[in-house]
């Protein structure tokens, strides 16, 4: 690989994007396909056949031998089935290469083999994948060769969504319709579409692959279940934005190139706070494309790490005692002609459309804080949220001094007359230029922060799909916009009505705004006084999916049916219980086969040392005896805690699948796991390093 990368030539070279379609498709076909992409017009089979043929020819030129409907079931990862382009051999023994419009538009994977939460029985196997033409197809190269990947939605035989993409597309249509109504009220007759724009900042850890293989907890669960803190962690703040090590730099270079080939706008890369932790952030894209790109990015991060002798960890909390990993979801609403509805301008107090959009979103987040919290619910996130590293589990909105002041003016006097300006920053060094500061600071502790012209939702877990949180954001915004438009369209005096509505929403939903320190213990108490929900675990958050409030919301905008919501809740409970069960069994396996034998071996060496030294000379052996007693005591505690965990784990199956089993796992199994970890981590600090059966935290996070 050469040192020089021609990014302009590389970018999108493996994507069947607009420029490729313009070049290869007949004009009529291209225009019809664009109408489908931009306006949702139905695509005829005649047009689909032409598109499929040209897509196949292009893919073959790129080295593809197979095609795949690439979709995102409710497993948390992508799925695909590869079919070759070849047809049955002809009489002369040769084959043709074929790909029809029908094969492009529809596939039939086995729906019974994916999570359905009761929507599909094992014998009800038929499911369909359907081409999402708004997200471009791409060719992916790996050891198997080239594969044409076609982004698709996945639904059951009876039409229920079994994936992440379908509800996301539905929610995008909902917010588009209602946002267009809103901007029409302000005289905008030219914009034809409003699209949620999303940029997902992806955090991850890199560790040496050989050391990863020696940690069964990492290989089975994605996180360390045991591990004592090394003498140094992240307390010196020297890793964040520090110099990137050569091995990691080479890795990042290849990650960027792989992303750029697939049209992923990988933009920013840097070291994160914890040792061995890093971040990759792209430029914004439409929400469905951003979700696809993030799934592709996670795969690239893992694949390239393996090539460089490393392992990429996407778990939210792979190491206790240092920061975990999240995925900040930056969300805004943009028209097809480039207007950002969340752009306040220089004088936000005069920007009435912006203030209406802003207060609608405050209303949406306040009304559906439980749903927004649930959209980030994940078993790994339970170990991350609420620490001094990630947002608290209470949803609140940070607006900053400028916007908070504007709203306070509206609430207290009924009129906003001014907006705070940013002052000039003077460094006191003549050779450094002075410049205007932003009107407000940032707040890294807020779960939902306004950051200039977008909202940044910081709760999402690092390995999770961003689809779910954007489904919620789009749908709750659509509801708030609809309710506002219903009132304003019927108002005799629009100017007066919109002013009153902004004031009403700002007043009624002021409790959701919090500009202080979200890490402070006092905030949890204040949030309780305000009546804000504090859903501290995944199990607490899941019921938000099936409340009558949620059902009414999602059914009104045709995003989910009641049955689909119930199925997703059941899947979430099942995922939680299975994940905890796997972690518990892994702890028991490691303790039985590695920890206890290693400690017995070490205490035997200590005992032999005591006897040998005593036999050789009349000297003090109190150090050896003290160490022997401590290790033996901790070994006994370890065995006792292991037995308690084994008992708790054995009873998991006694509880019905669903909420009861998940609650039991959280209340009993997780507690037993914590109690087993404590003596084992203490033992690690006492036992000879050469006898400890696995790499330490220091080995893992400081040796990449």
Please report, for each region that a protein language model flagged, where it lies by residue.
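Active-site core of metal-dependent hydrolases
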Residues: 10-125
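Composition- and surface-driven signal marking solvent-exposed, interaction-prone regions
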Residues: 218-219, 294, 316-317, 343-347, ...
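C-terminal amphipathic alpha-helical interaction region
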Residues: 507-704
């Amino acid at each position: 690989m050469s040192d020089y990368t021609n990014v302009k030539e590389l970018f999108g070279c493996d994507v069947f994007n607009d420029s490729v379609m313009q070049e290869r498709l007949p004009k009529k076909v291209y225009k019809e396909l664009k109408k489908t992409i931009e306006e949702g017009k139905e695509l005829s089979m005649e047009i689909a056949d032409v598109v499929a043929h040209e897509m196949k020819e292009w893919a073959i030129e790129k080295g593809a031998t197979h095609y795949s409907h690439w979709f995102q079931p409710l497993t948390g990862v992508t799925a695909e089935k590869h079919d070759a382009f070849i047809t049955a051999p002809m009489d002369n023994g040769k084959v043709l290469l074929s790909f029809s419009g029908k094969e492009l538009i529809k596939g039939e994977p086995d729906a019974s083999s994916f999570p359905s939460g009761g929507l599909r029985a094992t014998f009800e196997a038929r499911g369909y994948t359907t081409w999402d033409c708004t997200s471009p197809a791409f060719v992916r190269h790996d050891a198997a060769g080239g594969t044409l990947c076609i982004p698709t939605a996945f639904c059951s035989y009876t039409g229920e969504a079994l994936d992440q993409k379908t509800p996301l597309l539905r929610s995008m249509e909902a917010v588009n319709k209602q946002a267009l109504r809103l901007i029409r009220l302000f005289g905008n007759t030219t914009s034809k579409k409003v699209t949620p724009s999303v940029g997902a900042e992806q955090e991850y850890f890199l560790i040496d692959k050989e050391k990863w293989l020696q940690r069964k907890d990492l290989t089975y669960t994605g996180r360390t279940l045991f591990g004592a803190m090394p003498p140094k962690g992240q307390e010196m703040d020297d890793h964040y934005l520090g110099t990137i090590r050569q091995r990691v730099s080479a890795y990042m270079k290849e990650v960027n190139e792989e992303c750029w080939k697939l049209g992923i706008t990988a933009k920013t890369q840097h070291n994160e706070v914890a040792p061995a932790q890093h971040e990759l952030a792209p430029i914004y894209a439409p929400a469905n494309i951003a979700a696809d790109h993030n799934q592709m990015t996670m795969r690239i991060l893992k694949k390239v790490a393996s090539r460089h002798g490393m392992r990429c960890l996407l778990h939210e909390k792979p190491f206790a005692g240092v920061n975990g990993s999240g995925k900040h979801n930056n969300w805004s609403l943009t028209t097809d002609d480039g207007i950002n509805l969340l752009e306040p301008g220089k004088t936000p107090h005069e920007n009435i459309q912006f203030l209406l959009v802003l207060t609608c979103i405050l209303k949406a987040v306040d009304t559906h804080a439980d749903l927004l919290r649930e959209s980030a619910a994940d078993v790994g996130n339970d170990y991350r949220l609420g620490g001094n590293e990630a947002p608290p589990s209470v949803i609140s909105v940070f607006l900053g001094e400028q916007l908070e002041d504007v709203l306070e003016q509206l609430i207290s006097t009924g009129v906003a007359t001014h907006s705070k300006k940013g002052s000039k920053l003077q460094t006191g060094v003549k050779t450094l230029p002075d410049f205007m500061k932003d009107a407000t600071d940032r707040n890294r502790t807020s779960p939902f922060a306004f950051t200039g012209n977008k909202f940044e939702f910081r709760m999402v877990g690092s390995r999770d799909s961003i689809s779910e949180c954007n489904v919620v954001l789009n749908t709750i915004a659509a509801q708030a916009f609809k309710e506002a438009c219903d009132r304003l369209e019927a108002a005799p005096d629009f100017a007066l009505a919109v002013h009153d509505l902004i004031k009403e929403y700002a007043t009624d939903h002021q409790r959701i705004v919090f500009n202080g320190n979200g890490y402070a213990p006092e905030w949890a108490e204040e949030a309780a006084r305000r009546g804000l929900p504090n859903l501290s675990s995944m199990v607490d958050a899941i019921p938000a999916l099936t409340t009558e409030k949620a059902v009414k919301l999602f059914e009104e905008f045709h995003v989910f049916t009641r049955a689909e919501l119930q199925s997703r809740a059941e899947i979430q409970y099942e995922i939680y219980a299975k994940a905890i069960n796997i972690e518990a069994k892994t702890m028991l396996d490691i303790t039985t086969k590695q920890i206890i034998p290693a400690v017995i071996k070490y205490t035997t060496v200590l005992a032999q040392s005591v006897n040998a030294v005593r036999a050789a000379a009349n000297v003090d052996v109190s150090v050896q005896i003290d160490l022997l007693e401590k290790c033996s005591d901790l070994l006994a505690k370890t065995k006792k805690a292991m037995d308690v965990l084994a008992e708790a784990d054995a009873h998991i199956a006694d509880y019905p699948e669903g909420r009861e089993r998940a609650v039991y796992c959280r209340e009993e199994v997780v507690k037993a796991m914590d109690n087993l970890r404590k003596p084992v981590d203490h033992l690690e600090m006492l036992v000879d390093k050469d006898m400890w059966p696995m790499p330490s935290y220091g080995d893992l996070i400081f040796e990449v």
